[in-house]
Amino acid sequence: MDKFWWRAAWGLCLVQLSLAQIDLNITCRFEGIYHVEKNGRYSISRTEAADLCKAFNSTLPTMAQMEKALSIGFETCRYGFIEGHVVIPRIHPNSICAANNTGVYILTSNTSQYDTYCFNASAPPGEDCTSVTDLPNAFDGPITITIVNRDGTRYVKKGEYRTNPEDINPSSPTDDDVSSGSSSERSSTLGGYIFYNHFSTSPPIPDEDGPWITDSTDRTPATRDQGAFDPSGGSHTTHGSESAGHSHGSREGGANTTSGPLRTPQIPEWLIILASLLALALILAVCIAVNSRRRCGQKKKLVINNGNGAVEDRKSSGLNGEASKSQEMVHLVNKESSETPDQFMTADETRNLQNVDMKIGV
């Protein structure tokens, strides 16, 4: 039992260590815009997104800045926060990215957790893939923050960047998701590193029918092994020459704008480990109780004999091959008279003759 509790304490320590580490995957900068993914899944709230960009000496980008980055090849397959919206920049249509739409795809339901996009005003123009080696505005803290660049290089720093207590100790679990993409690149996360496959980009093709806007809540299935999908909620995209805050792009095949499957909550890892330990403890307790009952619950046989009769021990076999159960036996031996019927007849005749003699004498 002591060994069990030692293992349980060790497991809880490992859970706490895993919660005290943050991995930040960063893409190249396109006109100062870049994508940041935390711990390989959608796990950044809107308040944390602003704090994270601030830690990188950046800000949340505006829609105009996103459109400018899109025009030079910035493309991902991940939802992320910008100023006032949750978007995906798309150049090439893909059924599992932005519901097969192109342009800056806007998700109208933005109450959950996503990735974030940041804008660094001091970044060089065009595409910049220089490795990020610092988190300049982070303050002191116990968290181990690891910055993973596109080329696999890492920068590790102890500190903290979150200012909202709910972001530090979230009350609701985050959702696991697929890996992120980057501008003009499709990426996949493996062991904390990001591998990129470049492909050529082309500017958006305008639609001959002019501006349009669609709205729909239809849902299309998506597979996790192919790329990111659209979280729950209706979404929309715009096309053509619209005002600031809408996207410019093309739509392929006239397909309706759709959103992906519902985001299902995931049980935290520490809760799974704790439940497993409790279940193991319960199983061990039941086994110990059953074993103790088998040892202490055996019955002994009681034999009462007056010494004149023979006692035959009987054993009853249990069902299904179980051990035979002891029986409590009380054997009573009655002593029978040893006189024979002839002896009884002789005694009666003697008494009768005595009575006759007495009568004759009288």
UniProtKB/Swiss-Prot annotation:
Disulphide bond pairs: C28-C129, C53-C118, C77-C97
Topology Cytoplasmic: residue spans: 291-362
SMART domains from the UniProt entry: LINK (SM00445)
Entry comment on modification after translation: Phosphorylated; activation of PKC results in the dephosphorylation of Ser-326 (constitutive phosphorylation site), and the phosphorylation of Ser-292. N-glycosylated.
This protein's encoding gene: CD44
Protein's UniProt name: CD44 antigen
GO BP field: cell adhesion; inflammatory response; positive regulation of ERK1 and ERK2 cascade; regulation of lamellipodium morphogenesis; wound healing, spreading of cells
Localisation per UniProt entry: Cell membrane; Cell projection, Microvillus; Secreted
Function: Cell-surface receptor that plays a role in cell-cell interactions, cell adhesion and migration, helping them to sense and respond to changes in the tissue microenvironment. Participates thereby in a wide variety of cellular functions including the activation, recirculation and homing of T-lymphocytes, hematopoiesis, inflammation and response to bacterial infection.
Record region (Required for interaction with EZR, MSN and RDX and for co-localization to microvilli): 293-311
Domain Link: 32-120
Top-level taxon in the UniProt lineage: Eukaryota
Transmembrane segments: 270-290
Entry domain remark: The lectin-like LINK domain is responsible for hyaluronan binding.
Residue positions the entry lists as glycosylated: N25, N57, N100, N110, N120, S180, N256
Species for this entry: Papio hamadryas
PROSITE patterns cross-referenced by the UniProt entry: LINK_1 (PS01241), LINK_2 (PS50963)
Subunit structure, as described in the record: Interacts with PKN2. Interacts with TIAM1 and TIAM2. Interacts with HA, as well as other glycosaminoglycans, collagen, laminin, and fibronectin via its N-terminal segment. Interacts with UNC119. Interacts with PDPN (via extracellular domain); this interaction is required for PDPN-mediated directional migration and regulation of lamellipodia extension/stabilization during cell spreading and migration. Interacts with RDX, EZR and MSN. Interacts with EGFR. Interacts with CD74; this complex is essential for the MIF-induced signaling cascade that results in B cell survival.
Residue sites binding hyaluronan per the record: R41, R78, Y79, Y105
